[in-house]
Amino acid sequence: MWKLKIAEGGSPWLRTLNNHVGRQVWEFDPKLGSPEELAEIERARETSLKVRFEKKHSSDLLMRIQFAKENPRGAVLPQVKVNETEDVTEEMVTRMLRRAISFHSTLQAHDGHWAGDYGGPMFLMPGLVITLSITGALNTVLSEEHKKEMCRYLYNHQNKDGGWGLHIEGPSTMFGTVLSYVTLRLLGEGANDGQGAIERGRKWILDHGSATAIISWGKMWLSVLGAFEWSGNNPLPPEIWLLPYMLPVHPGRMWCHCRMVYLPMSYLYGKRFVGPITPTVMSLRKELYSVPYHEIDWNQARNLCAKEXLYYPHPLVQDILWASLHKLVEPVLMRWPGKRLREKALRTVLEHIHYEDENTRYICIGPVNKVLNMLCCWVEDPNSEAFKLHLPRINDYLWIAEDGMKMQGYNGSQLWDTAFAVQAIISTNLFEEYGPTLEKAHMYIKKSQVREDCPGDLDFWYRHISKGAWPFSTADHGWPISDCTAEGLKAALLLSKIPPDVVGEPLVEERLYDAVNVILSLQNADGGFATYELTRSYPWLELINPAETFGDIVIDYNYVECTSAAIQALTSFKKSYPKHREEEVDVCIKRAAMFTEKIQASDGSWYGSWGVCFTYGTWFGVKGLVAAGKNFNDCFGIRKACDFLLSKQLPSGGWGESYLSCQNKVYSHVEGNRSHVVNTGWAMLALIEAGQAERDPTPLHRAARVLINSQMENGDFPQEEIMGVFNRNCMITYAAYRNIFPIWALGEYRCRVLQAP
């Protein structure tokens, strides 16, 4: 039976700043599990398989089964149901909230954070399996149980047409299909295994132009594997790292996720590295293409891209650039004396790879650069300490649910979910009943704050300050983020107002000041806030975005979510510490509010870049403006936002927004006009903040009825459609949102609507 282990090390090759607080790793123990538990898990798997085309999202049941045993509850209050003709009462809401918080508390790990599925993208695990296969570590790192669950996941998420999507809910793409197919083959599945599933996948690939039409990231992965030629790739010259920083195209000016992925890619491209050509690789050369491998026109393949994966088409200027580099520059750099420049560039790139590894304890900023960096360390020296330090951190990215084992989009969303959960529970004004839960969460927040900047010259390493920031996940990961810092600060300030005998001692003032310093340092010239760093270059740099399937990735753009979170955190801080950097804080809030108003769409919405989508963005937009001192009566933007949200309320009383809103940038309802508990929670929170109850509380009563009636018998909420997004086009799971936002919305509803004088 699989067991989730929290805050444990277990390897001499693991490094940590805080005794692994927040670390979540699944391990298989064949001796664990009663017959009843094993039968329950098997039923969950069978159900997941049966409904896989209708319900593509796991309900995270393996963790729930484990925690139900480890964190038993007392008697569960009776379920609440509200008829259409019945009024929602305070007693109903209070009982529902107690049921919800009691259940959510059982999902809290002993170190204080909430664990959960952060999967969704289908292109992450293939990079890991390809890297482990090349380095010969596949069978060392992955047990037979790991491989079985990875295969289960891939088979479960194959679409009806035989292909795989970019993410679990997406239509089939060449990128998703080729990489998933290759992964199954490397995991030991035969070319005709899977009850015809692999054959259907191969047919999809060949029917849609073969693997020559995979996007550039896929071309790179196939090239290092040996199932594609480097001459079929557009150039990724490592020499770009030797350019003067003053140039707008210097990678140090790019969004950190972008530069941290293209950093190791450029190393592998610069060396034209190819792994061992095994019998499986030789077979893939036949299976993936419609013509013999040696007859493929690799030069033509450079710019081929299947229409199913083409979200961001190459502009002409990019095609000219790649052709020039490919035909004129690369031949010079591959031979003496140009080769000396290449060797210098490769050394520089390796220095930056090692710096990233060491300062994230070998977790790395994300799963793509994690496995690429690991591969580069092996290419440099297969017996290196760096490669050995990478291996145990693979487990930090793996998550298992009833649909199988996946690779997550980060090493978790621990701090993010915990900060939101704290705010949700406190919003109910029932927090004294849940002191132990909040005390553990408080401990996690305190232990996860980044305590020091990265070492060395930050300008040389293209890093921003991080002392005082909060990361998205764990202190060991350590990358500072504007909105995570803001949400961490908000939660810490709320907890500081509750007696220490209930939630523990508050964070010391100096550490609050450090957090404020980080937030103030991240405001851009136009008043907005980006994610990890200041915006360092220009939007026109998107012209050289080579990733055909992602949008807006080259620079760190401003976002309404980050800007609003900063406003909220600073206004909360100002109430407790009005004299600390008073003028700077006031100016920052004012400029951020002006930016928020400026980017509002004409229909009253804000586009959400990290959640689905206009509902999410509009919640942040309204919250930010209200926190900055504006209200419905004096702010046209807030009035427009309320009109927008009310116009999207469904006949059921809820809201339900599809991920299609993100990629098409037009509001789209969930299929069948179904409501979604998370969208409904976001919309309620925005409307309550904007004073909807004072004008007409009916929409709020109707929405509250939807949330109450959605609650399950045990106090949990159903997992519905996917609610997270990144880079416009790829969806990602936030498993805790289904619990957090109904609690938060009904907590605010209880205190600010039903209990209003």
Swiss-Prot record:
Gene3D superfamilies: 1.50.10.20
PANTHER family: LANOSTEROL SYNTHASE, TERPENE CYCLASE/MUTASE FAMILY MEMBER
PFTB repeat residue intervals: 147-188, 512-557, 589-629, 638-679, 700-741
Presence of keyword Lyase: no
Keyword Iron-sulfur recorded: no
Provenance organism: Betula platyphylla (Asian white birch)
Function according to Swiss-Prot or TrEMBL: Oxidosqualene cyclase converting oxidosqualene to cycloartenol.
EC identifiers of the protein: 5.4.99.8
Protein's UniProt name: Cycloartenol synthase 2
GO function terms (MF aspect): cycloartenol synthase activity
Family of this protein: Belongs to the terpene cyclase/mutase family.
GO cellular component, one term: lipid droplet
GO biological process, one term: tetracyclic triterpenoid biosynthetic process
Catalytic activity: (S)-2,3-epoxysqualene = cycloartenol
NCBIfam families: squalene_cyclas (TIGR01787)
Keywords of the record: Isomerase, Repeat
Residues annotated as catalytic: 483
